[in-house]
Amino acid sequence: MNDISTIFKEKKLKLTPQRIAVYKYLKSTHEHPSAETIYKAIQSDYPTMSLATVYKALKTLAEVHLIQELNVGEGNFRYDANSSSHPHIQCLSCGKVDDIMGITFDNLNKDVSSHTDYDVISNKLYFYGICKDCKDKA
């Protein structure tokens, strides 16, 4: 939890129990939960916390780069505590989102820069397919 304390102190932001709870939950899972899923998971420990508070905490955590906000389409967002640059794959059947680790963007960033008049600052790469569980059910 040192990283969140340090970052919030540097940014002069208030570190609330709600923000800590949301961050801890995200750090404890390899899933990419929605705000609603996070809310339901921590509601028993924080019964007075609203869904709006969870959304605000997620927005702040994303703004300080402690988490990633993943736009999985149609206004549907998921959240990832692994803030390093990495691609994701989403199941088109069940909506599950997984990390794809071990792929670097170095060459892709250079190629994009050399083919455009842009300096690449960041990127997000998504793949779509059918997960093993859904294939096994078919």
UniProtKB/Swiss-Prot annotation:
Sample GO molecular function, one term: DNA-binding transcription factor activity
Region DNA-binding: start-end pairs: 1-73
Positions contributing to Zn(2+) binding: 91, 94, 131, 134
SUPFAM superfamilies: Winged helix' DNA-binding domain
Any Pfam family matching the protein: FUR
Record's keyword terms, sorted: Detoxification, DNA-binding, Metal-binding, Repressor, Transcription, Transcription regulation, Zinc
Domain of life per record: Bacteria
GO biological process: negative regulation of DNA-templated transcription; regulation of oxygen metabolic process; regulation of secondary metabolite biosynthetic process; response to toxic substance
Null allele phenotype: Cells lacking this gene exhibit almost complete aerotolerance and increased H(2)O(2) resistance. Deletion of perR does not affect the intracellular level of iron but increases two-fold that of zinc.
Protein family (similarity comment): Belongs to the Fur family.
Entry function: Represses the expression of most of the genes involved in oxidative stress response, such as rbr3A-rbr3B, dfx, rd, nror, fprA1 and fprA2, coding for reverse rubrerythrins, desulfoferrodoxin, rubredoxin, NADH-rubredoxin oxidoreductase (NROR), and oxygen-reducing flavoproteins, respectively. Thus, by controlling primarily oxygen and reactive oxygen species (ROS) scavenging, PerR plays an important role in the oxidative stress defense system in C.acetobutylicum, an obligate anaerobic bacterium. Probably acts as a peroxide sensor.
Protein name in the entry: Transcriptional regulator PerR
Source species of the chain: Clostridium acetobutylicum (strain ATCC 824 / DSM 792 / JCM 1419 / IAM 19013 / LMG 5710 / NBRC 13948 / NRRL B-527 / VKM B-1787 / 2291 / W)
